[in-house]
Amino acid sequence: MFGKLLTKVFGSRNDRTLKAFGKVVNKINGFEEEYGQLSDEELKAKTKVFRERLEAGETLDDVLPEAFATVREASKRVFEMRHFDVQLIGGMILDSNRIAEMRTGEGKTLTATLPAYLNGLTGKGVHVITVNDYLAGRDAENNRPLFEFLGLSVGINVAGLGQVEKKAAYDADITYGTNNEFGFDYLRDNMAFSPAERVQRPLHYALIDEVDSILIDEARTPLIISGAAEDSSELYTKINTLIPNLIQQEKEDTEEEIGEGDYSIDEKAKQVHMTERGQEKVEVLLTERGMLAEGDSLYSAANISLLHHVNAALRAHTLFEKDVDYIVQDNEVIIVDEHTGRTMPGRRWSEGLHQAVEAKEGVHIQNENQTLASITFQNFFRQYEKLAGMTGTADTEAFEFQHIYGLDTVVVPTNRPMVRQDNPDLVYLTAEEKYAAIVKDIVGCRERGQPVLVGTVSIEQSELLHSLLKKEKIPHEILNAKFHEREADIVAQAGRTGAVTVATNMAGRGTDIVLGGNWNMEIEALANPTDEQRAKIKADWQIRHDEVVDAGGLHILGTERHESRRIDNQLRGRSGRQGDAGSSRFYLSMEDSLMRIFASDRVSSMMKKLGMEEGEAIEHPWVSRAIENAQRKVEARNFDIRKQLLEFDDVANDQRQVVYAQRNELMDAESIKDTITNIQTDVINELMDQYIPPQSVEELWDVAGLEQRLQQEYTMVLPIQEWLDKEDDLHEETLRERIVDTWINAYKAKEEMVGEQVLRQFEKAVMLQTLDGLWKEHLSAMDHLRQGIHLRGYAQKNPKQEYKRESFELFQQMLESLKHDVISILSKVQVQAQSDVEEMEERRRQEDAKIRRDYQHAAAEAIVGAEESAALAATQPQVREGEKVGRNDPCPCGSGKKYKQCHGKLS
């Protein structure tokens, strides 16, 4: 109550922000008349003046009013479009590390030109980030004339560009591209072997379009560069044949009654679990096929990999649906983005799930992958010095933007009042009744000439509706992941009189639906349109536009509520752009997944109380509230998943920053001779401490062990025992100095023989390749650790603290291994000439060429509640073949340490 009263008196935080920016808008408007009288050359010269002022010590805020006024005037001349005052406010929000919520049709693309130009003046680079290559290319080409008029260069960063083209794109003042490409380039730069191979400059300013899609929907998906691991396609095919023999259990087991099924599904958590009966049945089937020894258990340590394959196949068959979660195209399984309905070529599910789905669909099974480098979008974007974003729907996620990224959300008022009519939801008992009502609504709209956009949550739904409309002989266009080639054309004409367009989630489509159809596209379709043709097209469009407005504008029809209110708002936001007429309504049924999983009991009881009969719809605020509460529950759960993923990735991120910084230092250094000398001294001291403990008596020295280790690992044949026998005054400290001197002198002799330049180059190559190899193994170990860490909760330990502690131990072990491996290689390898180093480099390049880029999709579920798969992944490294190694035996890795002090630490 008091909060509302204070807001009434002082205004909300949003109002106060808008008021402050409103004062700057008045300053910008004050320059309009003066700048309107400048010649083109005088206006272009402003860029040089602003840059000189910035170099002289002025800030971007100092030049902002004049810079924005310059862009507005240039836009009037180049595009014949003038920035509205609300767009100027949007530009200021984006320049001040905030998120601007701007409704559809309010000109986000034009708004972005203001902060992009202002920050482009610094010469440090501006990255304008969109969700797909089409939008990146379109926005770059559309805005290029404006930026080039003002003397700024524009680059496009999309998939498939070569290194030279990428470097040129990044060197431009303003670079348009997709989040995937910027992220991949960051990882690739940190796998480069020379400064010349890097393409990115330091990350300065990122301006993200559809920011909620990239920073929230994509946040559960780590970005991964991977290389192919071993081929196990035959095993996936064999395991796939078992699953159709299993039966789903309808009810959960209770103390009184044990169910009949082989597996149970938890739809909420998207998990499937084998029952005891199912486990026994699978063991029998595996034994019959000769894949499991008679009497052996699927859960024994030696069969963990087999259990992992069975679980992956079970998930593929029970949780992942064709034309909902993925499509099959050109003998490949392609994931469909649940948020946008777009296909995501090149993106693959992790933990063998993608291979299991490929086996289920009978397509070519690709090899499993090994992670070479990875980062989450959250940690990638947090590295930018300045970060801002814009979207039509950010307010529902404002808390997450602030909590994770430190970005405030400001809602920008519309240029014209919103007049769209949002009707309450209609809820039916069955899906059949719901679809009958939807078709009836579409028929009504067509009769009065009102265009309809029908939003579905899956390809399967859009095709069901397609068949129903065909049956009723209603002409319509369908837009989903299978028919996306004509996307821009279909969306552009979706506002024509009586048009019916069925589309999967419309998020991020990027093309405005103009009432009466898009006349610009009609003109562009003509080769050389005359003025008469242009005038006729525009006049015809005006008639159609008025007809559509009289019919009620664009009608949005949702066939189901999405898990996120934001996606529903994005669909609604397609109508009512720039004060246009419009309406919207969602049709639901008790069989919809959201209702069935999260809201069924409460809503069903309400329906009974309200005396609902078959074929009737319910329209009541109680029901709408219950549905909204169900959506809030899902949003909260998804936020927790993203937050947990970030907390775990923050640990890896600290290590990633250390490794990448070290790598870049190595690469930029002309010589790492001093580093190698320091490592050599460290390695010798560690060996000495191990075999000749400090301040110990000679009887405790293991001289023979030290001589053997030096010879085996470092090809150093030193007569240490002979020295000790001959020289009485040789004690531990002087012996240590002699070994160091002998070692360094031997290395100097190698340098004289090979040549200093060749050896320096070789040292750098060895150091980088060894670091990359160990980092790759470390990432794999971290994955296994993370997937099983939740089990520590059963031992009354905090999984996050345990993960931090153990990952730090793994990291220390990696750094120790790096020192020993580098010195071992440099000691053993005989470099004859420059050609040897070049050959090594060439081999490395060939291996790099084989690396394929992949996404690991929905990996976060392994952290949150994936009991079985996480347990399997955690125990996988412990599978052993052959004899058991005793804790006090020498470690099989050849380090010379006891097993318990080396790789036994990980057991």
Curated annotation (Swiss-Prot):
The protein's matches in Gene3D superfamilies, at most eight in alphabetical order, are given as: Helical scaffold and wing domains of SecA (1.10.3060.10), P-loop containing nucleotide triphosphate hydrolases (3.40.50.300), SecA, preprotein cross-linking domain (3.90.1440.10)
Q: Name one Pfam family in it.
A: P-loop_SecA
Annotated Gene Ontology cellular components are: cell envelope Sec protein transport complex; cytosol; plasma membrane
Query: So where does ATP get bound?
Result: Q87, G105, E106, G107, K108, T109, D512
Record's subcellular location: Cell inner membrane; Cytoplasm
Which PROSITE patterns does the record match to this protein?
Answer: SECA, SECA_MOTOR_DEAD
**SUPFAM superfamilies assigned to the protein according to its UniProt record, in alphabetical order:** Helical scaffold and wing domains of SecA, P-loop containing nucleoside triphosphate hydrolases, Pre-protein crosslinking domain of SecA
What InterPro entries does this protein's entry cite? Helicase_ATP-bd (IPR014001), Helicase_C-like (IPR001650), P-loop_NTPase (IPR027417), SEC_C_motif (IPR004027), SecA (IPR000185), SecA_CS (IPR020937), SecA_DEAD (IPR011115), SecA_motor_DEAD (IPR014018)
The cofactors required by this protein are: Zn(2+)
Q: Which UniProt keywords apply?
A: ATP-binding, Cell inner membrane, Cell membrane, Cytoplasm, Membrane, Metal-binding, Nucleotide-binding, Protein transport, Translocase, Translocation, Transport, Zinc
> Which reactions are catalysed by this chain?
ATP + H2O + cellular proteinSide 1 = ADP + phosphate + cellular proteinSide 2
A GO molecular function assigned to this protein is: ATP binding
Topology versus the membrane:
Peripheral membrane protein
SMART domains per record: SecA_DEAD, SecA_PP_bind
| Record's cofactor remark | May bind 1 zinc ion per subunit.
Query: Is the keyword NADP in the record?
Result: no
Q: Which organism is it from?
A: Shewanella piezotolerans (strain WP3 / JCM 13877)
Q: Which family does it belong to?
A: Belongs to the SecA family.
Q: What does it do?
A: Part of the Sec protein translocase complex. Interacts with the SecYEG preprotein conducting channel. Has a central role in coupling the hydrolysis of ATP to the transfer of proteins into and across the cell membrane, serving both as a receptor for the preprotein-SecB complex and as an ATP-driven molecular motor driving the stepwise translocation of polypeptide chains across the membrane.
Q: Where is this region: Disordered?
A: 870-897
Q: What is its EC number?
A: 7.4.2.8
Q: How does it assemble?
A: Monomer and homodimer. Part of the essential Sec protein translocation apparatus which comprises SecA, SecYEG and auxiliary proteins SecDF-YajC and YidC.
Q: What is this protein called?
A: Protein translocase subunit SecA
